[in-house]
């Protein structure tokens, strides 16, 4: 009951929207108090708390159990540790598959030839998604065991590969490479799949160093299309390679605060290199805000699809049992267009180019092609 009361009070006092999106928050308190007093197991209690936060309807605020927070904390520290094949995947329920967003270097998945953009259809003959379209855990299992993975590369027929399970540890990978435009320009490409890992900004810096080792770049692509956001310090640390100073303002029920990126972290011209940022429906939270800031300041040309509009700043509130709630506390107003409401409009690209992640490889991706053409014509 103590955690419930703490959680309800936190939302009551700190939630961004004073009308609770039309929800009678006092009635919610009474409903859940009665359910808890009637008797709930630990699992049912945590499910109820998650449901209570979900009822706010902002599609952003969330509740995490102590076990979930342990995983989140490990990810932030760059200390993921589990047994599996070494991929980061996301469900694509409309095509009954999961698409690979990242492959851990040296992992069994990499050794088996799996790449980002590949889809996983089945594992040992069982669907990778459950009946509701959510990811299953069948890729995980005892260390040293082997699984049959039915995969499909965009544009190719499905095939099956044998992949062993081993202990996977370390940071979320940040893939990068130098691409060449049809006109011969050197363009850097960095896939930023999250700001949840505290090493991401350093990895972006290392990628910039590596890509400019043989000379300056003519352009830079930041691919935020699968970036669901994460922690503010990682978002700021990444953005500072390309921009500095005041970038906008956070606004909540009590006050307005300035987002100051601080001093620039230029790496071999990263503050001035022409930029393209790619966005889409899976660009969320600080993924959206970072893309919008680069567009708003004139620092980058944006290519892709309009984002869904989910730019609330979540604050983390920790409770006595180790659980945590991430509650929408602020919304964002860009520096040069403070009248803009990205929560309603999303980030609207300068050039609309649909490109579903699981339907194209990097080589065939129409958004990447459009970006390379942009640099040639600039």
Please report, for each region that a protein language model flagged, where it lies by residue.
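C-terminal recognition in membrane/secretory proteostasis and scaffolding
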Residues: 2-13, 17-30, 34-47, 77, ...
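Solvent-exposed, polar/charged alpha-helical surfaces in well-ordered, non-transmembrane soluble domains
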Residues: 2-9, 26-30, 34, 43-54, ...
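Sec-exported extracytoplasmic/periplasmic mature domains
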Residues: 8-20, 33-41, 50-61, 105, ...
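Extended, small/polar residue-biased N-terminal targeting/export presequences
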Residues: 19-97, 146, 155-175
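Extracytoplasmic
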Residues: 40, 47, 80-86, 93-98, ...
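Conserved PDZ fold ligand-binding element
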Residues: 109-131, 221, 302, 339
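Cleft-lining beta-strand/loop regions that shape enzyme active-site pockets
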Residues: 110, 133-320, 374
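C-terminal regions of proteins
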Residues: 257, 265, 318-319, 327-333, ...
